[in-house]
């Protein structure tokens, strides 16, 4: 497992305690299956934290099985932005998940999965308490300015503005298509 995954234990424990929840006195074992697939990233923190809260009786553990959770937990209990939310939500939708709890800062990107009105219900939260409230059906405060737009309207120059330099333009197109750096 990556260092980020190994550090998640402390992030989750501190986040739960600093949010006013108890943490189990006994050892907590979390199985991330399938074991043969390498786990990396902090996007599993929220799912693990909610699993612990469900096991401790803070939430209905059976109801939690129907909800997808994405997000990193800070030491203070905030639910932090993660990368790659859109493909995760699309994968959850394909697996039959109808509700997804995610960081408020990822909401704009996640809403791309709901274009045309389809896709899972999205519950954007800022901290662990809001996450618990959301899964219990309580109203959470509007996100307001906390939500960062995923797509910005920007006017970009394009290659029609450049005369000549055909080899350089072709190299740039190939580099971008392959997600390679240009510099």
Outline where the language-model segments fall.
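Peripheral, non-AAA+ core regions of ATP-driven protein-machinery
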Residues: 1-183
């Amino acid at each position: 497992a990556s260092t980020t995954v190994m550090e998640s234990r402390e992030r989750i424990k501190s986040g739960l305690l600093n949010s006013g929840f108890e943490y189990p006195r006994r050892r907590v074992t979390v199985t991330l299956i399938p074991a043969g697939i390498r786990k990396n990233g902090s996007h599993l923190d929220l799912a693990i934290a909610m699993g612990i809260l469900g096991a401790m009786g803070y939430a209905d553990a059976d109801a939690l099985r129907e909800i997808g959770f994405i997000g990193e937990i800070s030491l203070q209990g905030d639910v932090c932005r993660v990368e790659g939310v859109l493909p995760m939500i699309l994968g959850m939708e394909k697996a039959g998940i109808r509700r997804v709890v995610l960081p408020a800062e990822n909401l704009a990107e996640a809403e791309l999965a709901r274009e045309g009105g389809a896709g899972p219900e999205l519950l954007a939260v800022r901290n662990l308490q809001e996450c618990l409230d959301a899964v219990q059906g309580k109203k959470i405060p509007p996100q307001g300015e906390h939500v960062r737009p995923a797509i910005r309207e920007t006017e970009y120059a394009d290659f029609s503005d450049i005369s000549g330099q055909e080899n350089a333009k072709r190299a740039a197109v190939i580099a971008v298509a392959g997600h390679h750096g240009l510099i």
